């Protein structure tokens, strides 16, 4: 089994996006002549204002794998509408055997979330949130489950439009 090194690196490049490396795995391909070693990197990228992207990269060298992952994360960004530094409402996300429960929190709570979820909320610009991982804690699946849950979130205006009501009627 490949050894996993979990790293959280924070960089900010000239395009204003925040980058975090979540995990780097050493992977092995077994061929007739022996083993071929390589590295797989998992990263997240965000703009601090609700946009988030996840990327994976593989290469024979760590820096190349990380760069590939960052480039993929930049290409696959989604937009999540935030409300005062937290989420609109409680959401759940799932990917594989990983499930996450993400709830908004009041001011002063901070980010209460484990590992990969914390990195996502950091780069996304969420300042107050409570998140719980249920099931598998595999970093790849946790990141995908978190992004799945965030993509399911909708604003009061979207819900009002679906129901054919005003926002005031929805919020009560």
UniProtKB/Swiss-Prot annotation:
Query: Keyword set for this entry?
Result: Ribonucleoprotein, Ribosomal protein, RNA-binding, rRNA-binding
Biological processes per GO annotation: translation
Looking at the keywords, is Ribonucleoprotein present?
Answer: yes
Q: Keyword check for rRNA-binding, yes or no.
A: yes
Q: Name one GO molecular function term.
A: structural constituent of ribosome
Identify one Gene Ontology CC term for this UniProt entry: small ribosomal subunit
Query: What residues does the S5 DRBM domain cover?
Result: 17-80
Stored Gene3D superfamilies: 3.30.160.20, 3.30.230.10
One Pfam match, given by its short name, reads Ribosomal_S5
Show the domain comment. Answer: The N-terminal domain interacts with the head of the 30S subunit; the C-terminal domain interacts with the body and contacts protein S4. The interaction surface between S4 and S5 is involved in control of translational fidelity.
Q: Which family does it belong to?
A: Belongs to the universal ribosomal protein uS5 family.
What function does the entry list? With S4 and S12 plays an important role in translational accuracy. Located at the back of the 30S subunit body where it stabilizes the conformation of the head with respect to the body.
Q: How would you summarize the oligomeric state and partners of this protein? A: Part of the 30S ribosomal subunit. Contacts proteins S4 and S8.
- What name does this protein carry? Small ribosomal subunit protein uS5
């Amino acid at each position: 089994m490949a050894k996993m090194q979990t790293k959280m690196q924070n960089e900010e490049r000239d395009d204003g996006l925040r980058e975090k490396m979540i995990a780097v795995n050493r992977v092995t391909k077994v061929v007739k002549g022996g083993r071929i070693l390589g590295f797989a990197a998992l990263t997240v990228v965000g703009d601090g204002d609700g946009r988030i992207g996840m990327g994976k990269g593989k290469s024979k060298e760590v820096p190349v794998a990380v760069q590939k992952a960052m480039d993929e994360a930049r290409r696959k960004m989604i937009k999540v509408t935030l409300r005062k530094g937290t989420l609109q409402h409680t959401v759940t996300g799932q990917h594989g055997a990983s499930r996450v429960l993400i709830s908004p929190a009041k001011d002063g709570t901070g980010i209460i979330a484990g590992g990969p979820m914390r990195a996502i909320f950091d780069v996304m610009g969420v300042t107050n949130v409570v998140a719980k991982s249920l099931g598998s804690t595999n970093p790849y699946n946790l990141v995908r489950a978190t992004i799945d849950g965030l993509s399911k979130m909708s604003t009061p205006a979207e819900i009002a439009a679906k129901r054919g009501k005003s926002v005031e009627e929805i919020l009560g």
